[in-house]
């Protein structure tokens, strides 16, 4: 049976109280952002023990950690060493919390494999996947920016330890494709899912949409009538 979890941070009451709220609403698991209070780069032993104790007291399993990378994900060679190091720390933290899945947004995978960005992203994911697999874990790439067949083929090239975090709302809102068919295409690559809903209101170019945010392109978004 699938484990149903909440996103602890989204209760808006802080991490510890968010874990407690997850139990109160009947869930048995939580996904947590590896940031702020749970940023592995600054997390102290006492705080880690407090989180572990709260999880145990509230009968919550950490189903996944979310390692957010900010603008461009893993698209830029110059930025990747720092981002890869961070995600490896998140993988280690996940293992400490009994969690084998780290979800992340890697940017927009080009359809054209000859695009230089493709190899940059593939090599970064392959390194992270190998690190995760060696520890029995997964890096789960969130769906959305590119068609699911493109992402699936990309993940196959990355090797062990790289899977899909299947977000049906992202797929529908950005690519406008059938999310059910997307599950069939991604298949066993799926290691984590998000329960979200959404509609595609207007056609969008995924690279312009995602890179618009990364470049501070809010005015572009407004001019396209996406923000109303």
Task: Say what each PLM segment does.
Residues 1-14:
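Boundary/entry segment of secreted carbohydrate-active catalytic domains
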Residues 14-20, 54-58, 73-166, 173:
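Active-site acidic/histidine proton-transfer and metal-coordination neighborhood
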Residues 25, 33, 96-97, 135, ...:
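Structural motif
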Residues 4, 21-27:
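A short, Lys/Arg-enriched amphipathic alpha-helix followed by its capping loop at the start of a domain
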Residues 28-35, 61-66, 100-104:
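Short, well-structured secondary-structure segments
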Residues 30, 65, 123-228:
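Acidic/histidine-rich catalytic cores of soluble enzymes
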Residues 31-56, 105-113:
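Glycine-rich, proline-tolerant flexible connector loops at the mouths of alpha/beta enzymes
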Residues 9, 35, 70, 107, ...:
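Flexible loop residues that form catalytic
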């Amino acid at each position: 049976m699938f484990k149903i979890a909440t996103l602890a941070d989204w209760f808006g009451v802080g991490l510890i109280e968010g874990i407690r709220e997850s139990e109160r609403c009947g869930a048995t698991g939580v996904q947590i952002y590896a940031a702020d209070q749970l940023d592995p780069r600054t997390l102290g032993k006492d705080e880690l023990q407090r989180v572990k104790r709260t999880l145990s007291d509230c009968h919550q399993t950490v189903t996944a950690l979310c390692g957010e990378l900010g603008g461009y994900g893993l698209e830029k060679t110059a930025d990747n060493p720092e981002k890869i190091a961070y995600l490896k720390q998140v993988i280690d933290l996940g293992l400490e919390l009994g969690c084998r899945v780290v979800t992340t947004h890697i940017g927009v995978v080009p359809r054209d494999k000859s695009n230089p960005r493709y190899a940059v992203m593939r090599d970064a994911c392959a390194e992270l996947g190998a690190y995760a697999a060696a520890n029995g874990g997964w890096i789960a790439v969130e769906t959305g920016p590119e068609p699911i067949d493109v992402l699936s083929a990309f993940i196959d090239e990355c090797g062990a330890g790289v899977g899909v975090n299947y977000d049906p709302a992202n797929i529908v809102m950005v690519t406008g494709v059938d999310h059910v068919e997307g599950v069939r295409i991604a298949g066993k690559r799926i290691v984590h899912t998000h329960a979200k809903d959404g509609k595609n209101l207007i056609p969008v170019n995924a690279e312009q949409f995602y890179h618009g945010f990364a470049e501070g392109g809010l005015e572009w978004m407004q001019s396209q009538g996406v923000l109303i």
